[in-house]
Amino acid sequence: MDTSHAIKSCVLILLVTLLCAERAQGLECYQCYGVPFETSCPSFTCPYPDGFCVAQEEEFIANSQRKKVKSRSCHPFCPDEIEKKFILDPNTKMNISCCQEDLCNAAVPTGGSSWTTAGVLLFSLGSVLLQTLM
């Protein structure tokens, strides 16, 4: 086996390993509570190993004005319709959604997670490197 072929094999194995490796850090979620829809929420690492990113949106009447607020967080489980039963006011509407991908609880979909970006960059680098070695 010549040196060129060995290097190509090592690079290919390294690329496959990096692209298939499980995420080393925890789930990334946005976190904020009861903020206006226009407000951006900072991201944080979910402390639960099998946690869920949760997006909650509430619409209610306060001082004769309709208001909309959002909350973003991480939970060890996905809240469901049971959570809504604690609201006694019939003028309040609440939507809850759960997901298990990085930063998936945004109000407006983002351009993708940092893992997607890293994967694309790594794949591009690997392609260039393989072409250079051939």
UniProtKB/Swiss-Prot annotation:
UniProt xrefs under CDD domains: TFP_LU_ECD_Ly6A_like
Region forming the signal peptide: 1-21
Lipid-substituted positions (GPI-anchor amidated glycine): 112
Presence of the UniProt keyword Cell membrane in the record: yes
Disulfide-bond pairs as recorded: 29-53, 32-41, 46-74, 78-98, 99-104
PANTHER family cross-referenced by the UniProt entry: LYMPHOCYTE ANTIGEN 6H, LYMPHOCYTE ANTIGEN 6S
Name used for this protein in its record: Lymphocyte antigen 6I
Organism: Mus musculus
